[in-house]
Amino acid sequence: YYFMCGINGFNFKDIALIHDMSKITSSRGPDNEDYFSSENYTVGHNRLAILDPDKRSNQPFIYKNLILSFNGEIYNYLELKKILIEKGYKFLTTSDTEVIIKLFHLEGIESFKRLSGIFSISVYDKSSEKLYLIRDTIGVKPLYYHYNSFSKKFIFSSLIRGILISLDSKRLNYDAVHSYSNFNRNDCRETFYKEVFKVLPGELIQVQNGDFKRKNFLDLKLKKNYNEINIKADISTYFGKQFLSDVPVALSLS
């Protein structure tokens, strides 16, 4: 059972650790596993290929000084690709991956506001040594992180278990457990483990020189005064975009 790609990374160099983390997230992507590493950044990716299954779209995806690793789908990538082509960008793949990184190259973090889809994205800028993490407004695609204020080490992963293997102490967060047991959900930043946190839906995290900051960046835009015809038309449009794929598609209802 595959969940669409896994991403792992941290702001230091440790090849053994990225391999161990990638093994933990391997169930999320059977089609390719790879990593990028420098002295100040390491990132790995487990790929479940949906668009452009060719190896040219494997991740981490590098364009100039940018390194991208993401999990998800961008439903409006063809429209965005057209805009980029008009700006003079050329494309070597037919994936949404290349669209994300080149749009970021053009517009920086403002590019995230153009994306329609479900995603957890990591972008690293080698020139500024700055890491960006962002998650879609609904929070469909998971992304977790750990930050040690003493060592300045920052670690992120699609799975909590991917982070736990790097921690010396694994302590339960009883407040989060209590919240879940009472309400059958946990919408807070905290997870079941202390010192492991969620990137919240729509949140942007920036890490540079061992320091990180976070802010709400993407807002869920709700339209008022909708009539039944408009709702049906929008549902039909969005469903159509979600069926874009270069591999067989199935629909399961439960």
Task: Please state what every model-predicted region is.
Residues 3-254:
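Cysteine-centered catalytic environments shared across enzyme families
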